[in-house]
Amino acid sequence: MCADHGISSVLSLMQLVSSNFPVGSFAYSRGLEWAVENNWVNSVETFYSWQQQWIDGPLIYLEWPMLKRCYYYAQIRDEMNFFQCALRILSYRDTHELRLEERQRGKALSRIILQWYPFTDGGTWLSALEHSGLASIAWLGYTWSISLENLALGYAYNMLESATMAGLKLVPFGQITAQRLLRSLMERLPNDWKKSDMIADHELGNGFLLQSIASSCHETQYSRLFRS
């Protein structure tokens, strides 16, 4: 029974981080497209540095800590604090495009969730899921019995894979280079998760100013492939 349960959670995680599932989503570059257009990112090395800055800032100090908090509130069935967490995540998305992306991912995931788990206890849970893709991932992760650490690492992998595929088109570089970059970025994630697990509320924050600037400027970029 335990082995079957473990296999089921692994398969559920694989579904959740699949590129066909609306989690990281390949429609978004999160400012990378503008950074490439304006020569901030113009090589494999500068692309790698851009992703490292995302890990060292938003991932460790915002994405993972808020995922952890949402997971906890889903676990204890505290819908009001879960809802507040979803709103807080949205408030940290400091550009129009990043907020729009968060909502779009939330609405896409909530539509899928509703097909499997029709809510009968009011609209607070559903409203929270619609507000935030990250909150929706936390809710599904708990519901599917995926451990928090595996969920966090899977989420980070999905986001880095999406970014690498965007970089492959924009920088550009080849498939072999893309896989090498992704592998190198993945190797640091377990230790980074341990650091993120200790982040207190007063330490939460985005911490990637260049991405915020690039995302803001991308709103008016004339020719673009990505929504953000």
From Swiss-Prot:
Question: Where is the protein found, in the record's own terms?
Answer: Cytoplasm
Q: Name one GO cellular component term.
A: cytoplasm
Query: Where's it mainly located?
Result: cytoplasm
Q: Which UniProt keywords apply?
A: Chaperone, Cytoplasm, Nickel insertion
Q: Which Pfam families match?
A: UreF
For this UniProt entry, the molecular function terms from Gene Ontology, in alphabetical order, are: nickel cation binding
Homology family: Belongs to the UreF family.
Which HAMAP family does UniProt cross-reference here?
UreF
Q: How does it assemble?
A: UreD, UreF and UreG form a complex that acts as a GTP-hydrolysis-dependent molecular chaperone, activating the urease apoprotein by helping to assemble the nickel containing metallocenter of UreC. The UreE protein probably delivers the nickel.
- Role of this protein: Required for maturation of urease via the functional incorporation of the urease nickel metallocenter.
| Protein name as it appears in the record | Urease accessory protein UreF
| UniProt source species | Blochmanniella pennsylvanica (strain BPEN)
What is the primary gene name for this protein?
Answer: ureF
